[in-house]
Amino acid sequence: MKMIRVVAAVICDSIQTKHRIYATARGYGDYKGQWEFPGGKIEPGEAPQQALKREIEEELDTEIAVHDKIGTIEYDYPTFHLSMDCFWCTVVSGELILKEAEAACWLTKDELDSVQWLPADQTILEKIREMMK
């Protein structure tokens, strides 16, 4: 099975308090309309943190700071295996402008279940919820 390595930014309002996190709804493909943490593929020779900064700049026109790693998701979709490193991130500059996603919102820990998450992203939600205030 083909393996795809990606990174995801769990962008929070404050690295100390983590009251709200930013999620985007996919704007294309089989999972269009489902929610995910923004990010993307790691290019050859690129560190995960570098890939994350590049992807968020491309997708959201925003500069981020990458903080602690939350964990790695290993998930089998029907046609590929996904390995996704998830990191806490904060906005350094920019306005989180949607370039690829169809929608976005800030969610509190009580609102995490209010959107339909992509299957892989669902697997780390509980860990994120426990770390939010």
Summary of predicted features, one role per range:
Residues 88, 97-128:
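NUDIX/MutT-family hydrolases
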Residues 129-133:
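Generic C-terminal helix-cap and adjacent flexible tail
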Residues 1-21:
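Conserved N-terminal beta-strand and adjoining loop/helix that marks the start
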Residues 30-34:
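A conserved beta-turn-beta hairpin within the catalytic core of GNAT-like acetyltransferases
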Residues 37-69, 108:
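The catalytic Nudix box helix
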Residues 11-12, 23, 89-91, 106:
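Conserved hydrophobic "DFG−1" position in protein kinase catalytic cores
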Residues 63-65, 72-95, 103-105, 128:
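Active-site-adjacent beta-strand/loop module that shapes the phosphate/pyrophosphate-binding cleft
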